Amino acid sequence: MVRQAIIFLRVNSYNKNVKDIRNIIVDNKVDLVISNTVNVFQGALAAAFEHVKHFWLIHEFPEGEFGYYKEKLDFIDTFSDEIFAVTGALTEDLEKCFPNRKIYSFAPYTQIEPKEGVKTESNNQHRIVSVGRLTQRKNQLELIKAFQMLDLAGTELVFLGAWDEDYKQLCDDYIEEQDLKNVSFLGYLDDPWSEITDKDLAVFPSSMETFGLVYVESVLNGIPTILSDNAGHKSAFEYMNEQGHIYPLGDLDALTRMISEVLDGFDQEKLEAVQAVPSLKERYSLESVYANITEKIEDDELRHKKVTQKDIDFLNSRKALTKSVKSAMKKLFQLKKMN
């Protein structure tokens, strides 16, 4: 009974969300609703009720914690005038999921202000730096192992970002077991890029990304950069004119070799990284990354949405609420049985 009550409360909360969005659409004469993640559906329903356009922007691969949305593809298809996915591997994946419609691409955008100059308090010593939260998915332990294999006298390995406690402990244990020196964790910083020196090499060994915004920030700041070849990183690497170097995820020999080569030729690497910034800034402009979206915003036709008035009438009914609760209860019982 407690679970049933929780489900009813959740469904009622969703209904309130949809109603609130509908009121916003009406009060503000909204012509287009954009859902900026696959993980929400309320905007899609509100747009259908009010007969306005709805775009779905999908940043997530249909796997892992987001694998559930493979079962929701029909809903996404029905309630979207246009579907957009992060350029590269995700777009290719979703084209297979939606074979009967065009999936448009975009690049995730974040406001980046490249530094006019970088700190120079490096006493002419190179550092290997990695920006981002310390997590299993970010896979920083791979970089720590590579650093151990390199055994570079005087070179520091610096991590800039907060951390998940369990994963930080895993890294600390490895550092202690191997008696590694010159590894530091600076924690969260409002502006980690301000800590970068003109002698630093950035390395991002993440095991999974949708696009790789931290890589984008790195090359836009003119930093020599190495990144792993997970699907999201490859998409960003291709989008940013293949600036930097990419290595096979999990291949420690390849990573150590690449770090060594970049450090050996660092002056030329730095020069090329800085020279690439103007063209990369132009490529990664707001107008460029969202070009497909703005083009479709200007299109007055509702091209793909398949929802009918009959669907809307049903969703407005108490029967729909009952069906939603029954579906949720069924899933709970299935999970209980599995456990």
Predicted regions located by residue number:
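Glycosyltransferase donor-sugar binding loop
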Residues: V131, E156-Q169, F185
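Short hydrophobic beta-strand element within catalytic cores of glycosyltransferases
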Residues: P224-S228
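A charged, aromatic-enriched C-terminal amphipathic alpha-helix characteristic of glycosyltransferases
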Residues: D267-K323
